[in-house]
Design a protein with these regions (language model features):
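Cysteine-rich micro-motifs
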Residues: 195-207
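Short metal-binding segments enriched for Cys and/or His
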Residues: 206-218
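Short Cys/His-rich Zn2+-coordinating modules
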Residues: 156-168, 182-187
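Short, flexible, mixed-charge glycine/proline-rich loop motifs
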Residues: 167-177, 190-195
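Short Cys/His-rich "knuckle" micro-motifs
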Residues: 189-193, 211-214
C-alpha cells in the first residue's frame, strides 16, 4: 500500500539528487566552455574550488549540497569563472560574493556548519612552473602544465577563517521593495539610504560615487 497523508492523499516523495564531485578533467572542460578558452587561471580555479569543497566535506555542490555553500572570490579574472562552475555558486543566486581585492584567492563557507576556509594561490607556484618546464617559453603553457601536476601544498595556502554573513546577504533573503524618493527606481535588499527625511537609492544619495554619470541630469 502506498503511503498517504492524514487526508488520504498519496505521499509525494521528492527525488533525492546526488551527483558526486566530477573529475578534475570533466570540471576543467566545463570551465573552458563557460569561460570561452582554457588558461592557467582556469586550472587554478578548478583546483582551488575542488580543494575548498573537499576541506568542507561538500561532495555534491551542484546537487544535494547546493544550499550549503557560499563562495567569496577576490578577483574578477579567469579563476572566478572556474570556481563558479565547480561550486555551482552564482551571483544571481547570492551564493557568489565578489570582493575586489585583486587576489587569486577565494573563501568557501559551509552554511550548515559555519566552517569556512580561505585558499590563495602561492606566488611561488610561478617559479615552480619555470623549474618544471624550463624549455617552454610561453608562460601560460608552462603554468598550465605545471598547475595540473603540482601538489596542492605547492599551489595554495590554506587558512581556516570565520565569515560573519549578515542575514540580508544570505541566499534567499527577502525584503520590502522601496522606491527612491528622487529617481523613483525600486530598491531591493535594504540597500536604501536615509538622507534627512528622504529614502534614497545609493546613486541619488551620493551622486559623486556613482559608477556611471548621466549625460543629462534629470
Amino acid at each position: 500500500m502506498p503511503e498517504t497523508t492524514p487526508r488520504g492523499y498519496p505521499t509525494i516523495r521528492r527525488k533525492q539528487y546526488h551527483h558526486p564531485m566530477q573529475t578534475f578533467d570533466a570540471l576543467l572542460g566545463e570551465a573552458e566552455v563557460a569561460h570561452g578558452h582554457l588558461c592557467a587561471g582556469q586550472i587554478l580555479g578548478v583546483r582551488m574550488a575542488m580543494l575548498g569543497c573537499e576541506r568542507l566535506g561538500i561532495e555534491d555542490p551542484k546537487g544535494a549540497d547546493r544550499k550549503r555553500l557560499v563562495t567569496y572570490v577576490e578577483i574578477d579574472r579567469c579563476a572566478t569563472d572556474a570556481i563558479a562552475v565547480v561550486t555551482g555558486c552564482r551571483l544571481g543566486k547570492r551564493a557568489l560574493k565578489f570582493r575586489d581585492w585583486g587576489k587569486m584567492a577565494a573563501t568557501f563557507v559551509d552554511l550548515s556548519t559555519g566552517k569556512a576556509i580561505r585558499i590563495a594561490a602561492l606566488e611561488s607556484s610561478k617559479q615552480r612552473a619555470r623549474e618544471l618546464y624550463p624549455n617552454i617559453e610561453n608562460k601560460n603553457q608552462q603554468q598550465m602544465l605545471a598547475y595540473r601536476e603540482l601538489p596542492t601544498t605547492e599551489l595554495f595556502s590554506e587558512e581556516w577563517v570565520t565569515v560573519p554573513i549578515h542575514p540580508r546577504e544570505m541566499p534567499g533573503y527577502k525584503s520590502a521593495r522601496i522606491a527612491c524618493a528622487r529617481c523613483g527606481e525600486g530598491i531591493n535588499y535594504d540597500r536604501e539610504v536615509l538622507v534627512g527625511e528622504e529614502t534614497l537609492c545609493q546613486a541619488c544619495a551620493s551622486p559623486e560615487t556613482r559608477y556611471y554619470q548621466p549625460l543629462t541630469e534629470k
